[in-house]
Amino acid sequence: MKERHLFTSESVSEGHPDKIADQISDAILDALLEKDPDARVAVETSVTTGLALVFGEISTSAYVDIQHVVRETIKEIGYTDGKYGFDGDNCAVIVALDEQSKDIAQGVDDSLEIREGQVDPLDQIGAGDQGLMFGFATDETPEYMPLPLILSHKLMRRIAILRKDKVIKYLRPDAKAEVTVEYDADGKPVRVDTVVLSTQHDPDVSLEQIQADVKEQVIKAVIPAEYLDDQTKYFINPTGRFVIGGPQGDAGLTGRKIIVDTYGGAAHHGGGAFSGKDATKVDRSASYAARYIAKNLVAAGYAKKLEIQVAYAIGVAKPVSISIDNFGTGTKSEEEMIAAVRQVFDLRPAGIIKMLDLQRPIYKQTAAYGHFGRTDIDLPWEKLDKVAELKKILG
């Protein structure tokens, strides 16, 4: 019989260097999509002390003031003061963007299926790269997400609100959280075992003050009291000091927080990051579609926990494989579920773009606090509008 076990997930704040990079990349993507919904975008960002570097490939008819977008994004996050070692008005911004490779474009613009004479318009777009993507859902939270990750994200959102509203005046933008949850033998979360939270702060505040404020105004405000007990361990700023942070403390890079962005380590990951990529890149769009499928199958009652994998060949519209793992919790066979998925969901890139309406500027809001399980923003892949259709097929 399975025994109780612990599982840990982490999140980082919007002021974390890697997340600054993600938000800049997605802010540029949104600015381009606003003017040109067909823009092909693959934008990477790196940030370090006093410098933001934007590089990658773009094909578009739109003009966007990239420098302005970068600076505004940095300031919105909260880097507005030179003493942070990085601020939106005074940092250097270097832009080095090229056009998308014509070799890639020919396979994306006209898929293998179109080149072989098929006429379905949704076959038009070939996958922007090969790769494998995963979607996951679990019924352990109302968001259909793992509890340790949901709590970690909520801690980070809470501390950002307290900072931006100046409730706790000494807070600076960089922060990280990690939550360990204890599960019973049936896999049900029963308590929070450990909370780790590190936050950047002004130099003139005591560690005792930070620990008291964070415990009362952040942790206890976010984590339901029934999960906390006298055995719960708290590590708040355990190094003792966190004044130097953000890009001054560590260089940041787009796509380096892919587990924070997805399922907190509770599911597989195909390795492809999301931010800065338009929806012809299946790293992003197929991961969103896979989450949409997994969430609707779990919500429909066909599994308590489910993971789906899809895989693509570059320049080919149809996925090369679809597989499902219901971890022994399924009420239907995995083969039956895959057959239903093929009927209900179109997993060709153009089909995903149409199904989820992905040629819109909706991406910057996903670039911090997770792409999945969000209740604070309206995301099409979080909708449960396929439950009835799945029930009609699967019974």
From Swiss-Prot:
Its main location: cytoplasm. Residues 100-110 are annotated as: Flexible loop. ATP binds at residues 16, 174-176, 241-242, 250, 256-257, 273, 277. Its cofactor is Mg(2+); K(+). One of its GO terms (molecular function) is methionine adenosyltransferase activity. One of its GO terms (cellular component) is cytoplasm. It comes from the Bacteria. It holds the Pfam family S-AdoMet_synt_C. It is an enzyme of class 2 (transferase). L-methionine binds at residues 57, 100, 250, 281. It is found in: Cytoplasm. Its EC number is 2.5.1.6. Mg(2+) binds at residue 18. It catalyses: L-methionine + ATP + H2O = S-adenosyl-L-methionine + phosphate + diphosphate. One of its GO terms (biological process) is one-carbon metabolic process. Catalyzes the formation of S-adenosylmethionine (AdoMet) from methionine and ATP. The overall synthetic reaction is composed of two sequential steps, AdoMet formation and the subsequent tripolyphosphate hydrolysis which occurs prior to release of AdoMet from the enzyme. This is S-adenosylmethionine synthase. It comes from Limosilactobacillus fermentum (strain NBRC 3956 / LMG 18251).
